């Protein structure tokens, strides 16, 4: 089975950057303690305020079960990020499979 790299990319309103980063760190810390997913948030080196949420998942089953595992805290933080910080609420998703 191949691992899966799942990414969610978006741009954040510059004036809300600090508040976004605090919320993203809260989400990262929560995911670290309450999920088995390998999860991180990164910023594009060449484009300030362009962020990517990165999940490295062990297999298709873990990928397919991601939404089912969202509890109220994850849902609330994710909704806040998308509604308050993301420019025009626009996100770009990409899914990549490890070659084997």
Please name every model-derived segment.
Residues 13-15, 58-60, 100:
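Short coil/turn motifs at secondary-structure junctions
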Residues 11-22:
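Short, surface-exposed ligand-recognition loops at beta-strand->loop->(often short) alpha-helix junctions
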Residues 23-31:
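Short amphipathic alpha-helix segments
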Residues 1-2, 100:
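Absolute protein N-terminus
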Residues 92-100:
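Short, low-order "capping/linker" segments at domain edges
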Residues 11-13, 85, 95:
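Preference for well-ordered, secondary-structure-rich cores of eukaryotic proteins
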Residues 4-10, 40-69:
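Short, well-ordered beta-strand segments in beta-rich or mixed alpha/beta enzyme
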Residues 30-39, 56-92:
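An amphipathic, aromatic/His-enriched active-site/gating alpha helix that lines ligand/cofactor pockets
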